[in-house]
Each structure stands twice: as C-alpha cells, then as structure tokens.
C-alpha cells in the first residue's frame, strides 16, 4: 500500500501527515507535529526556516521508525513570504514574516509609482499590505543585488531537500506579481521592486515531480526513500483541493490562522466590481482559480489563548464563549490593528471603548466577541459573493481548524442563511496528499478525489436557525459602513 506524506506548515504549527488509500477510503495519521512562529531578530519579525527543515527530518525519521521504507512527499506552507538565496545556494538571511511592520504603508507608497488599477488588471490579486510585491518593495536593495534566486517558503524547503529549484504557480500567484492570464511574472511590476524574472526559478504546476532527496541527507538521518512532488504549495490551494464541495452553489471557507472565503472558478473575475470589493484570483491546481477574500481568522483566538498563558484549551475557550450572548459588540475583525498587536485582549477592549460599545472582560466574553464577529464578517462576505456571482451561495464548506468550532459554524449558518458543512479539519494535508495521488495515478482527478474525501471523513452539517438574529447582519453592515466613513 503506497504511503503519501504531507508536510503541512502553517503560521503557528507544522505537521507531517501520512495518508494511504484503503478500501476506497483515505486513512490519515499524524506522524509528527511541531510549533511554528516568528521571532524578532535583526530588526524584523523572522521565521526560523532551519528549525522547520530540521523538524521535517525528525518527522521523516519517525516515519522510517514506524516501518515505512518508501514514501511520496509534498510540501505546503503559508503564502507570500520568501527566502533570498545567493549564488552559493545558501540563504542570505532568515526570511522576514508577513506580519512584520515594514510594509504597513507600502501599498500607498508603491501605488504612487504604478496605479492600483494596473496592478489589479494585470494580477487580479487582492491588495494586502504584506503581499510579496510590497515586501520586495521594502527589501534591502543591496541584498537584492546579491540574490541569485527568490524562493517562496515551500519552494525553498523543496530545494533544500532535493537540490532542485522551482516556483510553483499557486503560491507564485499570491505574490501579486504574476500575470493573471499568461502565468508569467509581470516585468513592469518586477522592475518597480528592483528584481527580475531571472531571479525566480522555472514556474511549474502542482503535480510536478522533483524526485529523490539529496544523498547527503541519507548519511545524516535515518530516512525512508522519499520522492518529492510539488503539490499546490500554498496551503489554501491545497485546502481547496481537500474540500468536499457539497452543494450546487457552494463556497469554501478555509478557517485557520487566516480565513479565506470564496469559490472555485474556471475563468478569473477582475472587473470593476471585484476590484472595488478587493477580491483575489489566486491560481488553483489543474487550471482553476481560487476566487476569494483573505480576511482575519483564528489568529485573534490564538493570541488570546497565548495571552491567557495557555491555561485553557481551544475547546474550553469555546465552551466559555457558549455561555455568553453573541453580538454584544460589533468588531471589524479585518481592521489592521488586529494583525500584530502587542496584546490582542487589550486591543479588542480598546477598540470597543473607542467605538462606545460594551467591553468584553472575561475569557468567555472575549472569545464570544471574536467568534460572533468572525461569523458576521463571513456572512457579510457571502452576501458580497452572492452579488458578484449573480446567484445565492446556498452552501458553505468550512475546512481547517475552524471547522471544529461548532459555535462559530452554527452562528455563520444562521446569520448567512446557508447550509454549513464543516470538515475535514485537515483539508490542507488531505489536498496535499490528493495531488500526490493524482500524480502517481492512484486517483484519476480532483472530482473523484473529493468524493473519496466525503466518504472518508466525518463532515458535520449545520442548518440555519430560522427566526434568530434576523436583523443583526444588516446592523453589522451599517456599523462597518459607518466605521469606513
């Protein structure tokens, strides 16, 4: 029985998941888990990329110890961040995190040189101040001159493992430098940030085989034979592949540190209406586009948990929230002030004071403020999707860690008036593995793969509670409009 390993690294944790097809069902087991996070070093918030690679090898050693002698392996991580690699093939610095404050005003600065309309028409990508385009705009110019290759995080990890450099297209699209239809980097945008297309390795599709690990690794670690496949390396792209896609007019919500809500298209949408709403057209696997909005996710809850000294689990925090009435205050969860505050609890409380609302004090009140306002924001985005697509989204497929938060899922279903199918929580790893299986010929296509997912995992169904909170979405929309002036 073939074994497939997903290296799935998010902003707060990473894992190695092993998947196998057994009697038409995908069996998934976690082989290794580790923490992730940035640290302030050399004047910036940076990722410890060497630590992440070391943890991958620890996981592979565990897999070998478990009796697996040969595996396929794919790597996905968060998007937009990159590693600068010199001519000697070594990194020039530890990669800077997208949450670093260096790009806080970069959109305004860069768009004095090139218009927003040009950028959006060319790339179709949502304006976010941490996109790779703006990070490179703020990058050390002398360091860029020494750079031979600019590698996205998962591409760099694949390069270290195999010695082969590529630029996988689903992640490349998140840079806001990739041409929407040609699938090539836009030279005008590259020039504005002092880089050239030669500084990126060859663009490849998901499902490209990189091959075996470098021999040096086998002398250093006790490893199985590993065949590396370039999957949909942006974790959201993998998560969408791993979404069951229940319903006729469906949308997805990849609910983790970030919330990514949208639908899957065969033809991108980058007209005036979607430009105004700041939607993105990220490339998906197999010729699709992920039409979505990138908004705040469980990052707020993760920060609160940490600030409470981890004395509560997420399930315990959800229980405490369930004892509190929802919608006691309205919060624009996408406000930039919540992106990387010194203290999330204090930031939420200050926001409520400044807007003249009830201030949440207890852990339960704070968590309910987060969950209920995330649900409101999701419902608001679904109403925008309805308008853009010209039909009512009737089903929302929630995957990722947030699919386990029943309270938030039920509120979302009721407020948005949609059926919610929650799960699987490990959709990213599943989508990663599914691309490997398609590449190997074990699964014919994504459609059949999604049917396997539906039959393999527990998917919870939530339906709207009729008559509850019927006016709250309109009130929240009025609040957002007033706040934005």
From Swiss-Prot:
The residues listed in the UniProt record as binding ATP, with positions renumbered to this chain, are: 11-15, 257, 302, 401
User: What name appears for this protein in its UniProt entry?
Assistant: Rhamnulokinase
Q: Where is the active site?
A: 235 (proton acceptor)
Pathway where this protein functions: Carbohydrate degradation; L-rhamnose degradation; glycerone phosphate from L-rhamnose: step 2/3
The organism is Ligilactobacillus salivarius (strain UCC118)
Which top EC class is given?
transferase
Q: Which family does it belong to?
A: Belongs to the rhamnulokinase family.
- Pfam family, any one: FGGY_C
Q: Which gene encodes it?
A: rhaB
Q: Would the keyword Nucleotide-binding turn up in this protein's UniProt record? A: yes
Q: Which cofactors does it use?
A: Mg(2+)
Binding, substrate? 79, 234-236, 294
What EC number(s) does the entry state?
Answer: 2.7.1.5
The record's InterPro entries line, in alphabetical order, gives: ATPase_NBD, FGGY_C, FGGY_Carb_Kinase, FGGY_N, Rhamnulokinase
Q: What does this protein do?
A: Involved in the catabolism of L-rhamnose (6-deoxy-L-mannose). Catalyzes the transfer of the gamma-phosphate group from ATP to the 1-hydroxyl group of L-rhamnulose to yield L-rhamnulose 1-phosphate.
Q: Which reaction does it catalyse?
A: L-rhamnulose + ATP = L-rhamnulose 1-phosphate + ADP + H(+)
């Amino acid at each position: 029985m073939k074994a497939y390993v997903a290296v799935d690294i998010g902003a707060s944790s990473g894992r190695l998941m092993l998947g196998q097809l057994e009697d038409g069902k995908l069996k998934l087991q976690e082989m290794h888990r580790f923490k992730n996070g940035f640290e302030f070093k050399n004047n910036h918030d940076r990722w410890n990329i060497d630590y992440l690679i070391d943890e991958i090898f620890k996981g592979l050693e565990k897999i070998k110890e478990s009796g697996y002698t040969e595996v396929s392996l794919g790597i996905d991580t968060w998007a937009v961040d990159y590693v600068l690699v010199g001519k000697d093939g070594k990194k020039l610095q530890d990669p800077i995190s997208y949450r670093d404050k260096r790009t806080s005003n970069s959109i305004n600065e860069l768009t004095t040189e090139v218009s927003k309309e040009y950028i959006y028409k060319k790339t179709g990508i949502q304006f976010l101040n941490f996109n790779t385009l703006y990070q490179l705009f703020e990058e050390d110019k002398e360091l860029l001159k020494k750079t031979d290759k600019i590698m996205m995080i998962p591409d760099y990890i694949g390069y270290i493992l195999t010695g082969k450099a590529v630029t996988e297209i689903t992640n490349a699209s998140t840079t806001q430098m990739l041409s929407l239809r040609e699938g090539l980097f836009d030279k005008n945008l590259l020039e504005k940030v002092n880089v050239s297309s030669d500084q990126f390795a060859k663009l490849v599709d998901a499902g490209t085989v990189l091959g075996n690990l470098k021999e040096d690794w086998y002398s250093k670690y006790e490893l199985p034979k590993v065949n590396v496949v370039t999957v949909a390396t942006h974790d959201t792209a993998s998560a969408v592949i791993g979404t069951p896609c229940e319903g006729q007019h469906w949308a997805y919500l990849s609910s983790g540190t970030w919330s990514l809500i949208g639908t899957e298209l065969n033809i991108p949408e980058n007209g005036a209406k979607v430009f105004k709403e700041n939607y993105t057209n990220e490339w998906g696997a197999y010729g699709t586009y992920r039409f979505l909005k990138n908004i705040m996710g469980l990052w707020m809850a993760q920060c609160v948990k940490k600030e409470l000294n981890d004395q509560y689990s997420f399930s315990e925090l959800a229980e405490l929230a369930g004892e509190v009435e929802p919608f006691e205050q309205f919060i624009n969860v996408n406000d930039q002030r919540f992106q990387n505050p010194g203290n999330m609890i204090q930031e939420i409380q200050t926001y409520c004071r400044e807007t003249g609302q009830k201030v949440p004090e207890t852990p339960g009140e704070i968590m309910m403020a987060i969950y209920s306002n995330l649900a409101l924001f999701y419902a608001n985005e679904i109403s925008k999707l309805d308008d853009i697509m010209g039909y009512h989204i009737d089903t929302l497929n929630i995957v990722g860690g947030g699919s386990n938060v029943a309270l938030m899922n039920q509120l979302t279903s009721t407020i948005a008036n949609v059926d919610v199918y929650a799960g699987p929580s490990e959709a990213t790893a599943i989508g990663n593995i599914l691309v490997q299986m398609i590449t190997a010929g074990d699964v014919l296509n994504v459609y059949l793969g999604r049917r396997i997912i539906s039959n393999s995992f527990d998917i919870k169904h939530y339906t709207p509670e009729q008559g509850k909170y019927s006016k709250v979405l309109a009130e929240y929309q009025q609040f957002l409009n007033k706040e934005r002036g």
